[in-house]
């Protein structure tokens, strides 16, 4: 279904917006609009993506300033009416800062920026983001972050575990020290997803490492169902 309408938010300091648009527009063939952070009209969109990068230079902390951008109020309205929201890397950080997902992303345990390809286990295959993956899949996806260690209080962690909101885990172990090896979580509805790995960087059919392709195909499946 090539009619799924994507929007990719562009903050000052974003640097993965065009990577995402290349996948949604070039690979999936879906209409895709780059949305400047001051825009507020998201009414025609099905999926809004907050991409990776360093929004506002990561001043204060990652995502702390981006949460106040004009587009974020409209994003919350989009989510409230059942729209899909995806946050990748810095986008995940922004979603936690905005309260759309619980917990926080903090400095990596080793205090170093980590740029690598890592093992990622898919914990749920029944979501709009994962249905194209075989049961029990372990992927290889790129990560690139200095503040990617997921943390939350014990009660929140238990809720995430009990409600099945942990979608991706690092396998065999989190390189950044994330609690419970968490690499990505969703809200209770499954329509809002945040993850630190970059599926858009593993989706070019002409390059090695294509484990991100089923991620994007899953989104199309969910709208075709």
Curated annotation (Swiss-Prot):
The active site is at residues 89, 198, 200. One of its GO terms (biological process) is 'de novo' IMP biosynthetic process. Gene3D superfamilies: 3.40.50.880. Keywords: ATP-binding, Cytoplasm, Glutamine amidotransferase, Hydrolase, Ligase, Nucleotide-binding, Purine biosynthesis. Pathway: Purine metabolism; IMP biosynthesis via de novo pathway; 5-amino-1-(5-phospho-D-ribosyl)imidazole from N(2)-formyl-N(1)-(5-phospho-D-ribosyl)glycinamide: step 1/2. Residues 6-225 form the Glutamine amidotransferase type-1 domain. GO terms for molecular function: ATP binding; glutaminase activity; phosphoribosylformylglycinamidine synthase activity. It catalyses: N(2)-formyl-N(1)-(5-phospho-beta-D-ribosyl)glycinamide + L-glutamine + ATP + H2O = 2-formamido-N(1)-(5-O-phospho-beta-D-ribosyl)acetamidine + L-glutamate + ADP + phosphate + H(+); L-glutamine + H2O = L-glutamate + NH4(+). It comes from the Bacteria. It is found in: Cytoplasm. Its EC number is 6.3.5.3, 3.5.1.2. It holds the Pfam family GATase_5. One of its GO terms (cellular component) is cytoplasm. InterPro entries: Class_I_gatase-like, PRibForGlyAmidine_synth_PurQ. NCBIfam families: FGAM_synth_I, PRK03619.1. Part of the FGAM synthase complex composed of 1 PurL, 1 PurQ and 2 PurS subunits. Part of the phosphoribosylformylglycinamidine synthase complex involved in the purines biosynthetic pathway. Catalyzes the ATP-dependent conversion of formylglycinamide ribonucleotide (FGAR) and glutamine to yield formylglycinamidine ribonucleotide (FGAM) and glutamate. The FGAM synthase complex is composed of three subunits. PurQ produces an ammonia molecule by converting glutamine to glutamate. PurL transfers the ammonia molecule to FGAR to form FGAM in an ATP-dependent manner. This is Phosphoribosylformylglycinamidine synthase subunit PurQ. The gene is purQ.
